[in-house]
Amino acid sequence: MNRRESIMELNIEEIMEILPHRFPMLLVDKITELVPMDYAVGVKSVTINEPFFQGHFPGHPIMPGALICEAMAQVGGVALQYPEENRGLIPMFTGMDKVRFRSPVRPGDQLVTKAVIKKIVGRMGKVHCECYVGETFKASADFLFYLAEPENKKEKDENNK
């Protein structure tokens, strides 16, 4: 199979099967490209109806940098769910490095994040993310993740002892 054939797309329902986040903290609407063990590209359509715009900032709404980082981390978390043996594990980010913001993200923007897997060792992973609106660079960061067992799986395992 060549690289082009391995590109996948995920809709919101498929993303919600992978990530535990829900509104208002689910910050990825769709995955437009996913190449297992390589990268994922995710999209967040930013609307004026986002709850954070009520206070950040009235009359001059911009997406908080912490939520831009969270959107990048969520795309990175999806990328780490492939290969198949990682499915069902919860991607928890354990660190951020080299965080850079270049220009604000505003209502009406379509925030596109590319998350490139740099390293996976056991259940630990490192992902480099960059996000854009159109051709305009918005932010980048390196994320460290741990792929954790879900709490309900731990409880099941303990009950089966």
Say what each PLM segment does:
Residues 1-33, 161:
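N-terminal leader/capping segments at the start of a protein or of a new domain
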Residues 3-9, 76-112, 138-146:
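Hydrophobic beta-strand-centered segment that forms part of the acyl-chain substrate-binding groove
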Residues 7, 36-37, 106-109, 116-161:
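HotDog/MaoC-like acyl-thioester-processing domains
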Residues 16, 59, 101-103:
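Beta-strand-rich interaction surfaces with strong enrichment in secreted/lumenal proteins
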Residues 23-63, 68:
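Catalytic strand-loop segment that frames the active site of acyl-thioester-processing enzymes
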Residues 28-29, 96, 126, 140:
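Hydrophobic residues on conserved beta-strands that form the core of alpha/beta folds
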Residues 29-32, 97, 102, 114-118, ...:
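Conserved positions in beta-strands of structured domains
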Residues 31, 63-86:
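Active-site helix/loop of acyl-thioester processing domains in fatty-acid/polyketide metabolism
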